[in-house]
Amino acid sequence: MSNQHTLLSSNLLPVGSNISTWWNFGSMLLTCLILQTSTGFFLAMHYTANINLAFSSVIHILRDVPYGWIMQNTHAIGASMFFICVYIHIARGLYYGLYLNKEVWLSGTALLITLMATAFFGYVLPWGQMSFWAATVITNLLTAIPYLGTTLTTWLWGGFSINDPTLTRFFALHFILPFLIISLSSIHIILLHNEGSNNPLGTNPDIDKIPFHPYHSYKDMLVLTIMITLLFTIMSFTPNLFNDPENFSKANPLVTPQHIKPEWYFLFAYGILRSIPNKLGGTLALLMSVMILTTTPFTHTSRIRSMTFRPLTQTLFWLLIATFITITWTATKPVEPPFIFISQMASIIYFSFFIINPILGWAENKMQ
Protein backbone atom coordinates (compact mmCIF):
# COMPACT_ATOMS: atom_id res chain seq x y z
CA MET A 1 0.00 0.00 0.00
CA SER A 2 1.19 3.52 -0.80
CA ASN A 3 2.52 5.69 2.06
CA GLN A 4 0.65 8.75 0.75
CA HIS A 5 -1.64 10.53 3.22
CA THR A 6 -5.33 9.67 2.81
CA LEU A 7 -6.27 13.31 2.20
CA LEU A 8 -3.85 13.53 -0.73
CA SER A 9 -4.67 10.27 -2.45
CA SER A 10 -7.99 9.96 -4.29
CA ASN A 11 -7.77 6.16 -4.41
CA LEU A 12 -7.20 5.91 -0.65
CA LEU A 13 -10.23 8.09 0.11
CA PRO A 14 -13.27 5.88 -0.53
CA VAL A 15 -16.64 7.49 0.21
CA GLY A 16 -20.10 5.96 0.64
CA SER A 17 -21.83 5.67 -2.74
CA ASN A 18 -25.15 7.06 -1.47
CA ILE A 19 -24.10 10.44 0.01
CA SER A 20 -26.45 13.13 -1.34
CA THR A 21 -26.05 16.77 -2.38
CA TRP A 22 -26.32 17.79 1.30
CA TRP A 23 -22.75 16.46 1.65
CA ASN A 24 -21.45 18.98 -0.90
CA PHE A 25 -21.63 21.97 1.43
CA GLY A 26 -18.29 21.21 3.10
CA SER A 27 -16.40 21.78 -0.16
CA MET A 28 -18.56 24.86 -0.83
CA LEU A 29 -17.53 26.27 2.57
CA LEU A 30 -13.88 25.65 1.74
CA THR A 31 -14.36 27.55 -1.54
CA CYS A 32 -16.07 30.41 0.33
CA LEU A 33 -13.14 30.54 2.78
CA ILE A 34 -10.60 30.75 -0.07
CA LEU A 35 -12.71 33.42 -1.81
CA GLN A 36 -13.12 35.50 1.38
CA THR A 37 -9.43 35.25 2.34
CA SER A 38 -8.19 36.23 -1.14
CA THR A 39 -10.64 39.15 -1.66
CA GLY A 40 -10.08 40.29 1.94
CA PHE A 41 -6.32 40.36 1.37
CA PHE A 42 -6.70 42.73 -1.61
CA LEU A 43 -9.24 44.90 0.24
CA ALA A 44 -6.87 45.23 3.23
CA MET A 45 -4.27 46.76 0.87
CA HIS A 46 -6.56 49.75 0.23
CA TYR A 47 -8.56 49.96 3.48
CA THR A 48 -7.62 52.49 6.19
CA ALA A 49 -8.50 51.61 9.81
CA ASN A 50 -9.19 55.16 10.97
CA ILE A 51 -12.61 56.56 11.97
CA ASN A 52 -12.11 59.64 9.75
CA LEU A 53 -10.91 57.70 6.70
CA ALA A 54 -12.51 54.21 6.89
CA PHE A 55 -15.81 55.17 5.21
CA SER A 56 -13.98 57.16 2.50
CA SER A 57 -11.51 54.30 1.91
CA VAL A 58 -14.38 51.88 1.18
CA ILE A 59 -15.82 54.41 -1.33
CA HIS A 60 -12.30 54.78 -2.80
CA ILE A 61 -12.09 50.98 -3.25
CA LEU A 62 -15.46 50.93 -5.03
CA ARG A 63 -14.85 53.95 -7.27
CA ASP A 64 -11.12 54.35 -7.90
CA VAL A 65 -9.33 51.01 -7.38
CA PRO A 66 -9.28 48.94 -10.62
CA TYR A 67 -11.83 46.12 -10.15
CA GLY A 68 -12.20 47.21 -6.53
CA TRP A 69 -15.99 47.02 -6.84
CA ILE A 70 -15.65 43.31 -7.74
CA MET A 71 -13.44 42.67 -4.70
CA GLN A 72 -15.68 44.60 -2.29
CA ASN A 73 -18.97 43.14 -3.53
CA THR A 74 -17.59 39.60 -3.75
CA HIS A 75 -16.36 39.91 -0.16
CA ALA A 76 -19.69 41.30 1.11
CA ILE A 77 -21.97 38.89 -0.82
CA GLY A 78 -19.50 36.03 -0.20
CA ALA A 79 -20.03 36.47 3.56
CA SER A 80 -23.77 35.89 3.09
CA MET A 81 -23.07 32.86 0.87
CA PHE A 82 -20.69 31.57 3.56
CA PHE A 83 -23.40 31.70 6.23
CA ILE A 84 -26.09 30.19 3.96
CA CYS A 85 -23.76 27.22 3.39
CA VAL A 86 -22.87 27.06 7.13
CA TYR A 87 -26.50 26.94 8.26
CA ILE A 88 -27.39 24.26 5.68
CA HIS A 89 -24.27 22.31 6.72
CA ILE A 90 -25.34 22.43 10.41
CA ALA A 91 -28.97 21.53 9.58
CA ARG A 92 -27.71 18.53 7.58
CA GLY A 93 -25.63 17.47 10.59
CA LEU A 94 -28.65 17.68 12.91
CA TYR A 95 -30.97 15.83 10.50
CA TYR A 96 -28.64 12.93 9.74
CA GLY A 97 -27.23 12.55 13.26
CA LEU A 98 -23.69 13.45 12.20
CA TYR A 99 -23.14 15.06 15.62
CA LEU A 100 -22.44 11.55 16.98
CA ASN A 101 -18.96 11.98 15.52
CA LYS A 102 -18.23 14.14 18.59
CA GLU A 103 -14.78 15.50 17.71
CA VAL A 104 -15.89 16.67 14.27
CA TRP A 105 -19.10 18.25 15.65
CA LEU A 106 -17.39 20.09 18.52
CA SER A 107 -14.57 21.36 16.28
CA GLY A 108 -17.29 22.54 13.86
CA THR A 109 -19.06 24.43 16.66
CA ALA A 110 -15.76 26.13 17.57
CA LEU A 111 -15.40 27.03 13.89
CA LEU A 112 -18.91 28.53 13.84
CA ILE A 113 -18.19 30.75 16.87
CA THR A 114 -14.90 31.95 15.32
CA LEU A 115 -16.64 32.61 12.00
CA MET A 116 -19.40 34.64 13.69
CA ALA A 117 -16.81 36.72 15.56
CA THR A 118 -14.88 37.35 12.32
CA ALA A 119 -18.04 38.39 10.44
CA PHE A 120 -19.06 40.72 13.28
CA PHE A 121 -15.67 42.49 13.28
CA GLY A 122 -15.85 42.76 9.49
CA TYR A 123 -19.30 44.38 9.62
CA VAL A 124 -17.90 47.20 11.79
CA LEU A 125 -15.04 48.07 9.40
CA PRO A 126 -16.89 50.23 6.79
CA TRP A 127 -17.77 52.58 9.70
CA GLY A 128 -21.28 53.27 8.43
CA GLN A 129 -24.22 54.12 10.72
CA MET A 130 -25.37 50.52 11.20
CA SER A 131 -21.75 49.30 11.59
CA PHE A 132 -21.16 51.75 14.44
CA TRP A 133 -24.45 51.20 16.26
CA ALA A 134 -24.42 47.40 15.87
CA ALA A 135 -20.91 47.43 17.37
CA THR A 136 -22.09 49.68 20.22
CA VAL A 137 -25.07 47.45 21.09
CA ILE A 138 -23.25 44.09 20.84
CA THR A 139 -20.00 45.08 22.61
CA ASN A 140 -22.04 46.78 25.33
CA LEU A 141 -23.43 43.33 26.24
CA LEU A 142 -20.08 42.61 27.92
CA THR A 143 -21.12 45.01 30.69
CA ALA A 144 -23.73 42.40 31.71
CA ILE A 145 -20.91 40.17 33.03
CA PRO A 146 -20.82 40.60 36.84
CA TYR A 147 -17.73 42.33 38.34
CA LEU A 148 -15.56 42.14 35.18
CA GLY A 149 -18.06 43.52 32.63
CA THR A 150 -17.15 47.22 32.66
CA THR A 151 -13.39 46.52 32.69
CA LEU A 152 -13.71 44.08 29.75
CA THR A 153 -15.80 46.55 27.73
CA THR A 154 -13.33 49.40 28.32
CA TRP A 155 -10.48 47.06 27.35
CA LEU A 156 -12.24 45.97 24.14
CA TRP A 157 -13.14 49.55 23.17
CA GLY A 158 -9.68 50.89 23.99
CA GLY A 159 -11.33 53.76 25.87
CA PHE A 160 -14.64 54.82 27.38
CA SER A 161 -16.55 54.76 24.09
CA ILE A 162 -16.28 53.22 20.62
CA ASN A 163 -13.59 55.25 18.89
CA ASP A 164 -10.46 55.02 16.75
CA PRO A 165 -8.69 52.38 18.94
CA THR A 166 -11.82 50.18 18.67
CA LEU A 167 -11.77 50.27 14.86
CA THR A 168 -8.01 49.58 14.77
CA ARG A 169 -8.28 46.48 16.98
CA PHE A 170 -11.40 45.25 15.16
CA PHE A 171 -9.47 45.46 11.88
CA ALA A 172 -6.54 43.58 13.45
CA LEU A 173 -8.90 40.87 14.75
CA HIS A 174 -10.77 40.66 11.42
CA PHE A 175 -7.43 40.16 9.67
CA ILE A 176 -6.02 37.54 12.07
CA LEU A 177 -9.12 35.41 12.80
CA PRO A 178 -9.39 33.91 9.27
CA PHE A 179 -6.03 32.23 9.91
CA LEU A 180 -7.54 30.64 13.02
CA ILE A 181 -10.52 29.56 10.86
CA ILE A 182 -8.11 27.95 8.36
CA SER A 183 -6.36 26.09 11.22
CA LEU A 184 -9.65 24.92 12.76
CA SER A 185 -10.93 23.89 9.30
CA SER A 186 -7.83 21.72 8.83
CA ILE A 187 -8.45 20.08 12.22
CA HIS A 188 -12.15 19.63 11.33
CA ILE A 189 -11.28 17.92 8.00
CA ILE A 190 -8.54 15.71 9.53
CA LEU A 191 -10.90 14.56 12.30
CA LEU A 192 -13.61 13.83 9.71
CA HIS A 193 -11.28 11.70 7.58
CA ASN A 194 -10.25 9.78 10.68
CA GLU A 195 -13.64 8.05 10.66
CA GLY A 196 -14.99 9.00 7.22
CA SER A 197 -18.27 10.55 6.12
CA ASN A 198 -21.60 9.10 7.19
CA ASN A 199 -24.54 8.74 4.76
CA PRO A 200 -28.27 9.66 4.58
CA LEU A 201 -29.37 6.22 5.80
CA GLY A 202 -27.11 6.32 8.86
CA THR A 203 -25.88 2.80 8.03
CA ASN A 204 -22.31 1.48 8.11
CA PRO A 205 -20.64 3.24 5.14
CA ASP A 206 -17.96 0.51 4.81
CA ILE A 207 -20.43 -1.80 3.03
CA ASP A 208 -20.43 0.11 -0.27
CA LYS A 209 -17.72 2.65 -1.03
CA ILE A 210 -16.48 4.29 -4.23
CA PRO A 211 -13.44 6.54 -4.91
CA PHE A 212 -14.00 10.22 -4.15
CA HIS A 213 -12.56 11.15 -7.55
CA PRO A 214 -14.15 11.26 -10.11
CA TYR A 215 -17.60 10.34 -8.71
CA HIS A 216 -18.02 12.90 -5.93
CA SER A 217 -15.48 15.49 -7.12
CA TYR A 218 -17.53 16.17 -10.28
CA LYS A 219 -20.67 16.49 -8.16
CA ASP A 220 -18.79 19.02 -5.98
CA MET A 221 -17.74 20.98 -9.06
CA LEU A 222 -21.34 21.20 -10.31
CA VAL A 223 -22.65 22.62 -7.01
CA LEU A 224 -19.68 25.01 -6.78
CA THR A 225 -20.40 26.26 -10.32
CA ILE A 226 -24.03 26.92 -9.33
CA MET A 227 -22.93 28.78 -6.17
CA ILE A 228 -20.33 30.95 -7.95
CA THR A 229 -22.83 31.70 -10.77
CA LEU A 230 -25.39 32.80 -8.16
CA LEU A 231 -22.78 34.96 -6.38
CA PHE A 232 -21.73 36.74 -9.59
CA THR A 233 -25.37 37.15 -10.71
CA ILE A 234 -26.23 38.90 -7.41
CA MET A 235 -23.04 40.97 -7.65
CA SER A 236 -23.83 42.07 -11.21
CA PHE A 237 -27.53 42.90 -10.85
CA THR A 238 -28.29 43.60 -7.16
CA PRO A 239 -24.92 44.09 -5.39
CA ASN A 240 -26.56 45.77 -2.36
CA LEU A 241 -29.14 43.02 -1.81
CA PHE A 242 -27.76 42.09 1.64
CA ASN A 243 -26.70 45.62 2.66
CA ASP A 244 -28.55 47.86 5.12
CA PRO A 245 -29.52 51.29 3.69
CA GLU A 246 -28.37 52.93 6.97
CA ASN A 247 -24.81 51.78 6.26
CA PHE A 248 -24.53 54.13 3.27
CA SER A 249 -24.30 56.99 5.78
CA LYS A 250 -21.08 57.63 7.69
CA ALA A 251 -21.14 56.69 11.40
CA ASN A 252 -22.55 59.45 13.58
CA PRO A 253 -22.51 58.86 17.38
CA LEU A 254 -25.07 61.68 17.83
CA VAL A 255 -27.77 60.15 15.60
CA THR A 256 -29.26 56.78 16.52
CA PRO A 257 -30.86 54.75 13.68
CA GLN A 258 -34.58 54.09 14.14
CA HIS A 259 -34.00 50.34 14.20
CA ILE A 260 -30.56 48.90 15.07
CA LYS A 261 -29.93 45.44 13.65
CA PRO A 262 -26.89 43.37 12.63
CA GLU A 263 -26.41 41.51 9.32
CA TRP A 264 -29.19 39.05 8.38
CA TYR A 265 -27.11 35.98 9.35
CA PHE A 266 -26.99 37.12 13.00
CA LEU A 267 -30.67 38.03 13.22
CA PHE A 268 -31.73 34.69 14.77
CA ALA A 269 -29.31 35.21 17.70
CA TYR A 270 -30.19 38.92 17.91
CA GLY A 271 -33.92 38.05 17.93
CA ILE A 272 -33.38 35.67 20.88
CA LEU A 273 -31.36 38.39 22.67
CA ARG A 274 -34.14 40.97 22.15
CA SER A 275 -36.94 38.63 23.26
CA ILE A 276 -35.64 38.65 26.86
CA PRO A 277 -36.18 41.98 28.69
CA ASN A 278 -33.27 41.35 31.10
CA LYS A 279 -29.76 42.31 29.90
CA LEU A 280 -27.83 39.42 31.51
CA GLY A 281 -30.58 36.93 30.62
CA GLY A 282 -30.58 38.13 27.01
CA THR A 283 -26.78 37.88 26.78
CA LEU A 284 -26.83 34.31 28.15
CA ALA A 285 -29.64 33.37 25.71
CA LEU A 286 -27.58 34.87 22.85
CA LEU A 287 -24.57 32.72 23.80
CA MET A 288 -26.71 29.63 24.35
CA SER A 289 -28.39 30.00 20.92
CA VAL A 290 -25.08 28.80 19.43
CA MET A 291 -23.50 26.92 22.36
CA ILE A 292 -26.55 24.63 22.71
CA LEU A 293 -25.34 22.84 19.56
CA THR A 294 -22.55 21.31 21.68
CA THR A 295 -25.13 19.38 23.74
CA THR A 296 -26.56 17.29 20.86
CA PRO A 297 -23.86 14.54 20.83
CA PHE A 298 -24.49 13.91 24.55
CA THR A 299 -28.30 13.92 24.47
CA HIS A 300 -28.92 11.54 21.53
CA THR A 301 -31.12 8.71 22.83
CA SER A 302 -32.51 7.05 19.68
CA ARG A 303 -31.19 3.68 18.49
CA ILE A 304 -31.36 5.05 14.94
CA ARG A 305 -28.73 7.65 14.05
CA SER A 306 -30.44 9.48 11.17
CA MET A 307 -33.88 11.15 11.13
CA THR A 308 -34.60 9.50 7.74
CA PHE A 309 -36.72 6.78 9.39
CA ARG A 310 -38.01 8.83 12.35
CA PRO A 311 -41.16 10.78 11.28
CA LEU A 312 -41.82 12.27 14.75
CA THR A 313 -38.33 13.72 15.02
CA GLN A 314 -38.54 14.92 11.40
CA THR A 315 -41.61 16.99 12.31
CA LEU A 316 -39.70 18.49 15.24
CA PHE A 317 -36.70 19.25 13.00
CA TRP A 318 -38.79 21.14 10.42
CA LEU A 319 -40.45 23.03 13.28
CA LEU A 320 -36.92 24.11 14.32
CA ILE A 321 -36.19 25.35 10.78
CA ALA A 322 -39.50 27.28 10.68
CA THR A 323 -38.69 28.74 14.12
CA PHE A 324 -35.21 29.81 12.95
CA ILE A 325 -36.77 31.67 9.99
CA THR A 326 -39.47 33.22 12.22
CA ILE A 327 -36.90 34.56 14.74
CA THR A 328 -34.85 35.99 11.83
CA TRP A 329 -37.97 37.73 10.48
CA THR A 330 -39.10 39.15 13.87
CA ALA A 331 -35.59 40.53 14.51
CA THR A 332 -36.00 42.79 11.46
CA LYS A 333 -39.15 44.32 13.00
CA PRO A 334 -39.41 47.05 15.67
CA VAL A 335 -39.61 46.06 19.36
CA GLU A 336 -43.39 46.34 19.71
CA PRO A 337 -46.43 44.01 19.83
CA PRO A 338 -47.07 41.52 18.25
CA PHE A 339 -43.38 41.02 17.31
CA ILE A 340 -42.21 40.82 20.95
CA PHE A 341 -44.63 37.96 21.69
CA ILE A 342 -43.87 36.11 18.41
CA SER A 343 -40.13 36.42 19.10
CA GLN A 344 -40.51 35.11 22.68
CA MET A 345 -42.64 32.13 21.58
CA ALA A 346 -40.24 31.30 18.73
CA SER A 347 -37.25 31.49 21.13
CA ILE A 348 -38.95 29.05 23.55
CA ILE A 349 -39.67 26.62 20.66
CA TYR A 350 -36.04 26.98 19.42
CA PHE A 351 -34.56 25.89 22.76
CA SER A 352 -37.32 23.30 23.31
CA PHE A 353 -36.08 21.35 20.27
CA PHE A 354 -32.89 20.39 22.14
CA ILE A 355 -34.96 19.22 25.15
CA ILE A 356 -37.77 17.41 23.29
CA ASN A 357 -35.46 15.70 20.75
CA PRO A 358 -33.90 13.23 23.27
CA ILE A 359 -37.36 12.55 24.80
CA LEU A 360 -38.75 11.75 21.33
CA GLY A 361 -35.76 9.49 20.65
CA TRP A 362 -36.49 7.57 23.84
CA ALA A 363 -40.23 7.34 22.93
CA GLU A 364 -39.38 6.04 19.44
CA ASN A 365 -37.20 3.33 20.97
CA LYS A 366 -40.22 2.19 23.02
CA MET A 367 -42.41 2.08 19.89
CA GLN A 368 -40.01 -0.12 17.90
UniProtKB/Swiss-Prot annotation:
Protein name from the UniProt record: Cytochrome b
PANTHER family, per the entry: CYTOCHROME B (PTHR19271:SF16)
Entry's cofactor comment: Binds 2 heme b groups non-covalently.
GO biological process terms, semicolon-separated: mitochondrial electron transport, ubiquinol to cytochrome c
The family this protein is said to belong to: Belongs to the cytochrome b family.
Keywords of the record: Electron transport, Heme, Iron, Membrane, Metal-binding, Mitochondrion, Mitochondrion inner membrane, Respiratory chain, Transmembrane, Transmembrane helix, Transport, Ubiquinone
Record organism: Notechis ater
Subcellular locations according to the entry: Mitochondrion inner membrane
A GO cellular-component term linked to this record: respiratory chain complex III
Membrane topology summary: Multi-pass membrane protein
InterPro entries per the UniProt record, alphabetical: Cyt_b/b6_C, Cyt_b/b6_C_sf, Cyt_b/b6_N, Cytb/b6-like_sf, Cytochrome_b, Cytochrome_b_C_euk/bac, Cytochrome_b_N_euk/bac, Di-haem_cyt_TM
